[in-house]
Amino acid sequence: MVQLTIDNARGVTLCRVSLPANATVQQLLLQLTVAKPELRQAQAIRNDVRHVTHRLTPASTTTTTTTSVVSSNAQTLLQAGLVGQGATAETLVVLMAADAPAAASSAAAAAPSPTKAVAAQILDLFGCASASPSAGVRSQASVVPSTMDERQLELQRRIYAQIQQQQIDENLANALEYTPEAFAKVTMLYVPCTINQVLVKAFVDSGAQNSIMNKRTAERCGLMRLVDVRMRDVAVGVGRQEICGRIHMTPVNLAGMYIPFAFYVIEDQAMDLIIGLDQLKRHQMMIDLKHNCLTIDNINVPFLPENDLPALAALGDDENAMHAPRHQDPATTATTASNPAAPVLSEGERQARIEGFMTVSGITDPTQAAELLEAADWNPNVAAALLFDT
C-alpha cells in the first residue's frame, strides 16, 4: 500500500488515501471524489518530486466508468509515474482548470525550496505516523530519501527535533488540562506505633523486601541487646548500606495490637523504621488507599496526615520540588544550556559562522543569517529553531 497525500496547487493538504501501487488512476480519482467531491473537475495530477504531470481525460472526471472509454486514466499509478517502485508514501498535487495552464508553464519554477521541501517531508512523516494502521509501515528509504544531501539531512534532523519538542509541549499541556492531579505531591504512608513505650513513626513500604530499623532507633528503643550480629551483611539497593544484624522478634504496638515483628538493623538509614513486604504479608496487612488506612484483620490504622509526617519526609518533598523539572521553551533551554552568556567573537569568527549557517540552512541572504545568529547569541542550533518557527 502507498500512503498518498493529496495537495492542491497552493500546497494545502486536501486529504490522504491509501492505494496499492498497481491501482489505476481512475481508482484514485474515485477515492478522491468520495473524499472531496469538487475534485471530480480535476484536470491533471502532478508529482513534484518525480517531475511528472499526468493529464486526465474528460471521461476520468466522472464517478462512473464504462468499458468503451479507454484513456490514460486506465494506466496504473506506477505506469503513470505518479508513484515509485517500492514507495510507501508519495505527495500528489491535484490541478484544477485554473491551475493546470500555469502549472504547465512554470513547473520548474514552482518547485519548493530545499528547506520547505524537507519541512514538508518531516511534517508528512509525523502525519503518517498518526494515521490509521492501514497506512502501513514506512520503509527506511521513505524516512531518509536518497535525493537528500548532507545539508538537507541536517535540516531534517533539526526539524524533527523541533516537531518532537512541540509534541512534548502539547502532551504536557494536555496532561495539565485533563489530569492535573498527576502533578500533585504524593503524601508518604506513615503509621504511628510504639516499641518498648517509645513512639515511632513507621514508613509503610510494600516495595521493601524486608522490614528495617536504623541503629539510632534500635538504641532509643533499647533493642541493641537483641541484635544478632551473625546476620551481618551489606544491603544493596540505591547505594550500599551496612546491616548490623537482625532482631528476630520484638512486639510492636499498632492501634493497641501487639504484633511480633522482625527487623534488620541498618547502620546509617534515614528513616527510623520501615514496615516492608515481609511483615505486610506475614500479618496479612492491607494498604487501603481508598480509606487512607492500614487494615490489620478488621482494625484500621489511619495513615498520618501530612502535617504529622516526620521532618525527613517533609524535607524530602521540598527537595523533590526544588529539583523537579520545569517547562522551558526549547530555544531558551538550548541557549542557557549551550551558551550561558553571549560569546565574544571576532569579526572573522562571526563571518565564518554566518557562512556555515547559510550552508546548512539554505539561506542565501547574509543579512538574514546574521540577524538570526545574533538573536540566538550566535548559536547555530537555536538560530535554526528560530528559522523553522517562522
UniProtKB/Swiss-Prot annotation:
It is found in: Cytoplasm. GO terms for biological process: proteolysis. The keyword Protease applies. It is an enzyme of class 3 (hydrolase). Its main location: cytoplasm. GO terms for cellular component: cytoplasm. Its EC number is 3.4.23.-. Inhibited by pepstatin, diazoacetyl-DL-norleucine methyl ester (DAN) and nelfinavir. Inhibited by the proteinase inhibitors lopinavir and ritonavir. It holds the Pfam family Asp_protease. Keywords: Aspartyl protease, Cytoplasm, Hydrolase, Protease. Optimum pH is 5 with RE-(EDANS)-SQNYPIVQK-(DABCYL)-R as substrate. Residues 330-343 have a biased composition (Low complexity). Disulfide bonds: none annotated. Transmembrane segments: none annotated. InterPro entries: Peptidase_aspartic_DDI1-type, Peptidase_aspartic_dom_sf. Residues 322-344 are annotated as: Disordered. The keyword Cytoplasm applies. The active site is at residue 205. GO terms for molecular function: aspartic-type endopeptidase activity. Coiled coil: none annotated. Aspartic protease. Belongs to the DDI1 family. This is Protein DDI1 homolog. It comes from Leishmania major. The gene is DDI1.
